[in-house]
Amino acid sequence: MNNNLPTGSIAAVVDLLNKENVIAYPTEAVFGVGCDPDSETAVTRLLALKQRPVDKGLILIAASFEQLKPYIDDSILTAAQRKAVFDCWPGPVTFVFPAPATTPRWLTGRFDSLAVRVTNHPLVVALCNAYGKPLVSTSANLSGLPPCRTVEEVRAQFGDDFPVVEGATGGRLKPSEIRDALTGELFRQG
């Protein structure tokens, strides 16, 4: 069975997400795997697939800042900090924001913060808009293997039955940069 999901079948992808499935999709640099951030079942599936401990925390990718607001606390950002963030968005820079106590631990891990990004990848923007919220986003690769850059690489690592949204990555060579929204500290070079 081939579970390739053509870019025109966003409704089919949303249906899979609503059923707590993990999917693969192209992002700015590599393919990502993602799921519904509000579903502990889906996130647990993603973590098991990636062999990733829950305490590391995850990244949310969204079409707009509004989609991220329920998961973060931006109230303590100064005007300058807010400008630094919004000058980079939409785009391939992930920012770590304080997280309110209501943000699930399966997203934040051992932290009181959450990494989030407003993407400029058109397919991911369309997907998040159709879904009405952000997606958990982590690189599509099994532990110890390089991140996938093509549908074929996703198939090779995850199998032919794994649902993959067809499309091209944004052409960036490195994963997104990660910075602290409050301090500007660089956690990962992009």
From Swiss-Prot:
Required for the formation of a threonylcarbamoyl group on adenosine at position 37 (t(6)A37) in tRNAs that read codons beginning with adenine. Catalyzes the conversion of L-threonine, HCO(3)(-)/CO(2) and ATP to give threonylcarbamoyl-AMP (TC-AMP) as the acyladenylate intermediate, with the release of diphosphate. Residues 7-190 form the YrdC-like domain. One of its GO terms (molecular function) is tRNA binding. Its main location: cytoplasm. Keywords: ATP-binding, Cytoplasm, Nucleotide-binding, Nucleotidyltransferase, Transferase, tRNA processing. It is found in: Cytoplasm. PANTHER family: SUA5, THREONYLCARBAMOYL-AMP SYNTHASE. InterPro entries: DHBP_synth_RibB-like_a/b_dom, Sua5-like_dom, TC-AMP_synthase, TC-AMP_synthase_SUA5. Belongs to the SUA5 family. TsaC subfamily. Transmembrane segments: none annotated. GO terms for biological process: regulation of translational fidelity; tRNA threonylcarbamoyladenosine modification. GO terms for cellular component: cytoplasm. It comes from the Bacteria. The lineage of its organism: Bacteria, Pseudomonadati, Pseudomonadota, Gammaproteobacteria, Enterobacterales. Its EC number is 2.7.7.87. This is Threonylcarbamoyl-AMP synthase. It catalyses: L-threonine + hydrogencarbonate + ATP = L-threonylcarbamoyladenylate + diphosphate + H2O.
